[in-house]
Amino acid sequence: MTRTAFLLTILFLPTRMVSAQQPSDAQLRFFETNIRPALVKYCYDCHSVDAGDSRAGLLVDTRQGLLQGGDSGPALIPGNHADSLIWEAINWEGYEMPPSQKMPPEVIAHFKTWIDMGAPDPRERELLEFKTRITSDDIADGRSHWAFQTPEKPTGNIDSLVFEKLTEQGLQPAIQADAYTLVRRINFDIIGLPPTPSEIEAFVFAYERDADLAVRQKVDELLARPQYGERWGRHWLDVARYAESSGSRNTPYPHAWRYRNYVIDSFNNNTPYDQFIKQQIAGDLLPAKTDEEWNRNLLATGFLAIGMKHHDEKNPRKFMSDMVDEQLDTTTQAVLGLTVACARCHDHKYDPIPTDDYYRLAGIFYSTKTFYGTARVAQNHRPSDLILLPVQDAVASGVIGGRNQSQEQMKNQIADIDRQMQGVRGKDRRELRNQRNRIATKLASLNPDGTPKSFGMGVQEKDEMVNANILIGGEVDKPAQEVPRGFVHLFDNLNFTVSSRQSSGRLELAAALTSKDNPLAARVMMNRVWMHLIGKPLVKTTSNFGYAGAEPTNPELLDYLAVRFMEEDWDIKQMIREIVISKTYRRSSQHMDANHVLDPDNEYNWRANPRTLDAEALRDAMLVLSGRLNSERPVGSNSIGRPVAKNADQNNVHRSVYLPIDRDNVPESLSLFDFADPNITSTGRLESIVPAQALYMMNGDFAGTSAAAMAANLERKYSSLTERVQVAFHWVYGRPPTPAELQASDLFFRDFKFTSTASPTIRTENTGRPSDRSKGSRKRNGDRRGPGKRQAGPGGLVGDIELGPVQHTPLSVFCQTLMSSAGFRILN
């Protein structure tokens, strides 16, 4: 079945490509007699290279300058004077050129004739010449770097390859971790949530009978849960620099959440990694058997659309150049672990990647149209379309915002504005046009029956393919020679060629990136998987496998993992399973003095690496302990069509992966705990321990509310203080308390001085107790949860606590103390 992507044009003026037909002599004479003199007389002073001025980003001294246009878009659409901005400007319709006085009527008439005949213009921009310093011999020599060699599978397995390195270094492996430590580690690593007491008890029992079998069964159970995709999908969202706003002016991306959901579903469905990458680079070009598959492929290309954009950039060429650079940089770092974008302004300083290789790749993205879905409003000089999805999900996207209006009302408003614009010039006309654009955007987002359409961010092929010109120093006004679309010459073994002049090359790029002959794709991904499970990558520079990057601490192990990954048809779950069941993963984190002297940083994995819980796991664990976690996926996103509040995380009880991510306003519960920078590709999180984190855990509203809810659940389920204390340790630490901890707890309660403020109201659903607060209050507080599956807390209770002043009861303070401790935050 042939599938066509339906495009919603939201008030965006595209550039039309002109046929290559040569103008006739008569047409050129008309230009030289009537148009060139007028441009020189009326326009060159403000819009030419010789004058040293390009006001509003517009140059009119070459044909390319007119076609590319300036801040407001292409100035010239050959064959169509009515849609050409230069025609509007010389008639003083919204724009006024020249500003001092209008051109004579006969000159204006000449421009109409000239544009409608195809705008013949012999003036060509003089190109500079760029000469690379990197030779073919340099590139050939560069292939000797370890990362550019084809990985070869060594003899052995994970444990034998690790033990071989330990023996070489004179190190002894630590003992295996106890069952309590191991089940907590496995749970957080695979699903990002703590195990319940019943799960712990079952695992400990099974582990004592057959440790290997218990681990295998636990791993398989967790990999089958939907929470796995939420945990591991978030790892990829770091790489994909996922956010729901553009950065810079922070224009919202109302439909970014669809890409987020695609990623989570892909991990849960165990989509092979090579297919996962192909979908994100060229999903719109892949065959699809059903509308659902086509829908999924389109949403996958949101990977190229969700990056940071400078919407206040007035020069459209600069905006496009920066967007292409961001797409190219993200793609090459994410999949290849190479900093190809460093060759944008000059030859790469470390790797044999010449600047023309950068622009060979850039041509692929210049031939791709990006749909990121921001409407033309004040301060957004670069609006965009969206892709209308073939499968409508009836999600009330909220993109309309504000008060509801009927379609008829909006049509009447547009007609009224059109009438007002007829007698208005200058600034007032532009303001009316912006107002019209906003209303038209709302109207275009509705079906005829008034229901919202389903849109997605993504990319598609442009109507006309282009090759990129090398830009000297990366400057858009310093173009040099054109280079054909292609791939980095380092990988000539992949035999990359663009299949036709009508192809951007994205489909071929996707195939090259995931080819089993590509030495980097499998290595880069397996290095990250190892890092997420073991705590340290084999290659420290996770997004730079080039000459400036680090060498692997165990190259044989990295190659083993890479080859196994490809042998298993790029099955991520299988590789997670293989690593977690290994004895290397299952080691204790206990300190060994002799080993520490030889390998203080545990580079060779003689023990498990103690790690801090990342921001999402920490917040989600507190929601679980409080019994407040809503494990259902929310519909859409809270951020749709509106700015994200700094405290958006406070009332939101869904998993943290569903929190709205505003590039300039990340929720505090994430930003304080080393959340990935959403402006760039992040392939690993920092681990910091700073005072602000401790203050948040001890004094923050979210932590206090969670502790109060946990204490209330303990009080309802257990009658004695001794039971409550013992169970609290099981819930928070995943193990029973030690005698010393019980003694310290006894002293805590004996010495506690009671202080009180207003008490929160807690309702436990299984007791039927009503909340004192009204539903209206909840709505005013911004709770958008709606009905959903609430995940029971460790004790089996499902709590619902409203935010407010927290009563500092002895038990709630005790619970908050446990949550604030290293025993909770550190994963041993």
Question: Could you tell me what each predicted segment is?
Answer:
Residues 125-127, 590-591, 758-759:
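Flexible, disordered linker segments and immediate boundary regions flanking tandem C2H2 zinc-finger modules
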Residues 204-214, 752-770:
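Charged, solvent-exposed helices and adjacent loops that form client-binding or oligomerization surfaces
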